[in-house]
Amino acid sequence: MSLFETDSWSAAVFTGRWTPAAGGDAPVVSPATGAEIGRAGSANAEDISAAAERAAAAQRGWADTSFEERAAVLRRAGALLEENGDEIMAWLRRESGAAPGMAGFQVHVAAAECYEAAALASQPYGEVLRTGKPRLSFARQVPAGVVGVIAPFNAPLILSTRSVAPALAVGNAVLLKPDPRTAVCGGAVLAEVFRRAGVPEGVFQMLPGGIEAGEQLVADPNVRVISFTGSSAVGRKVGEAAGRYLKRVHLELGGNSPLVILDDVDLDAAVSTGAWGSFLHQGQICMTAGRHLVHERIADEYVEKLAAKADALPVGDPDRDEVALGPLIDAGQRDKVHSMVTTSVDAGAKLVAGGTYEELFYRPTVLDRVTMDAPAYADEVFGPVAPVMRVSSVDDIADIAKASPYGLSLGILTANPMRGMEIADRIPSGIVHINDQTVDDEAVAPFGGVGDSGTGSRFGGTRANIEAFTETQWVTMQADVARYPF
């Protein structure tokens, strides 16, 4: 059975049922072809406000549902994602430009997020406390209420599910606002999956929209927690707005992650790892290896081999061809990437591969001898670009790596893992991989960054998800009513 066996989702938002949005609708466009491949609802502030009211009304009943029933719903959601994997992967290829491997990975991880969330529903949420009075004293975790999720375009299925599933598991209602550029993969798919899985009406709602919808979601008094994944620039604005309303906000933001290649490494393995870390999904991943810090003894050979690999990677429409890289999401992103490459070359970097494009298809690019002030090194590119900086010592590596304001992921490649850990201890980062590249994700592992990469929030794993989507409540209980001196 097709996930979208009817066109009821077309030009609609999901409020527990598919319905037109007060804000109208918008086209769903394939970045590979430029063709309109569907239409999605486009929520405005009125839509968000009404949805938040419905969510607040529905949340208490969902929280009162037994943990077994919530877990069963999430297990069914995971199974539906797997059963409809081929159809979902086709949408990921067409709508987000994901190559087949990346599309399959998203389905796998999204299903895993649902299964892990199902297990979360039965976890103990509290602890018994010591008390100096004749009473029972304990702390417990209670649902936050209504959680607003703002998800990006780049890995839309994973980055929506990562917040939606655990928030539902612990008894919250959820409003999901996917990026309008990936309203199907990041929104409609999950709406239909959770509808079929049995989430009650009003508990999960999906409303694509632009700035107006996002601002209302952050401001609405019925929404108590915001989970935002996106750029650091927008994340700052979301954090500032949430602060005005004393609202909890989880910010998973950009990265400019360093990949350190030491001189004792297996060079061919390092080149394979570096290419994957920088070019996977056209570099449109927050954890992408954005800076290659290569020991000067092996730098010439590393750059030569990395450039050869970049030149050999096929680029094209992932829905029609066997390709390693698909298109960038839109012309604005392509122009930003190309500007950062050309200005870095003007600043002294050497272009050794790529640096060209046709339409939205950008060739994997290698820049050698970049400096710390080159745009492609200093900031997040979010494109298939591997800037290489040559380093001469461990002190250089640590100083250069931690000079960036970002701190999401760190990869260190070396024949001596303990040497790698010693370096890692000197570089602030939310994630560290010794002898692997910077891009990885597992539903059981905490995920998040420091500095400009986020608020240190974590997604994944029991403790992180409970902390993210519940509030701590202190409770005391005694047999008789207390008496006082007056």
Stretches with model-predicted labels:
Residues 36-43, 58-64, 149, 259-262, ...:
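Short, well-ordered beta-strand elements within core beta-sheets of diverse protein domains
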Residues 1-135:
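N-terminal Rossmann-like NAD(P)+-binding subdomain of aldehyde/semialdehyde dehydrogenases
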Residues 34, 70, 92, 114, ...:
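Residue-level signal for inorganic ion chemistry
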Residues 31, 45-48, 67, 85, ...:
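Residues at or immediately preceding the N-termini of alpha-helices
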Residues 233-371, 395, 434, 481-485:
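ALDH superfamily catalytic-core signature
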Residues 126-269, 391:
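Rossmann-like NAD(P) dinucleotide-binding subdomain of oxidoreductase/dehydrogenase enzymes
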Residues 33-39, 223, 260, 314, ...:
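Conserved C-terminal structural/oligomerization subdomain of aldehyde/semialdehyde dehydrogenase
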Residues 59, 63, 78-85, 89, ...:
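Structural signal for hydrophobic packing residues in well-ordered secondary-structure cores
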